[in-house]
Amino acid sequence: MNRLNGKTAVITGGATGIGLAAARRFIEEGAFVFIFGRRQEALAAAVAKLGPSARAVEGSVSSLPDLDRLYAAVKAERGTLDVVFANAGVGSQLALGKITAEHIDETFDTNVKGTIFTVQKALPLMGKGGSIILTGSSAGTTGAPAMSAYSASKAAVRNLARTWAEDLKGTGIRVNVLSPGPTATELAKEALGEEGQKVFASRTPLQRMADPAEIGAVAAFLASSDSSFMTASEVAVDGGLAQL
């Protein structure tokens, strides 16, 4: 399929996990992709895997100057932008009673503030037919021990899409949320640990964690015109975890 032929996409958190899987799928479907992340070594490795239709920009979504550099690079090489996949996120476990201000700041700076400015700074390059995809989480609608800051940040992301769909009326730009469940990424392994991964996998009707490529496939659908009448929607790709 070439559903994204000629399209330009930005994927934050694009060097590993869901972001890398989405970048691979976007390129397979014809897109030119800019991946954005904090670790230069991981970015370089990702570009080596993705090939000539990928570029890497190092930076953090919590840094506005870094985001400015990202979009300056997009404008200089491609001129316009068709797809933004605001995928960068962090998550760690701290139970109520142990939560710190630093924990809240790190979580919300990346997952909420970072998402807001990733999208806002992209808008001048986007036009009719553009697609914005926000990474939510099954944790945004369900409770999980010691994950209150992360869960709250992802619930906020869900409602950003609702509000932005109103703000973007008349522009032809769509905004939707892709909410994965337990996925075998580096972030999940770090946040959940081995036992936590087993617990989450056992809670899904499919009795397993997702492969990042399965999430990337849905991101490609939301990026393409196949989802042209979708905005303000949340697509759960969670093995049924948050649906029962």
What do these predicted ranges mean?
Residues T142, A220, T231-L244:
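Short C-terminal tail/terminal secondary-structure segment
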Residues T8, A15-G17:
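Conserved glycine-rich cofactor-binding loop
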Residues F85, K169, R174, M230-A232:
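Short, small/polar-rich loop/turn modules that mediate ligand/substrate recognition or access, typified
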Residues S137:
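Residue(s) in the substrate-gating loop at a strand-loop-helix junction
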Residues P124-L125, E166-G170, S228:
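Alpha-helical segment proximal to the catalytic Tyr-Lys
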Residues A95-L96, T100-F108, A188, F200:
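Substrate-binding pocket helix/loop in short-chain dehydrogenase/reductase
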Residues V119, S153, A161:
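Active-site helix of classical SDR
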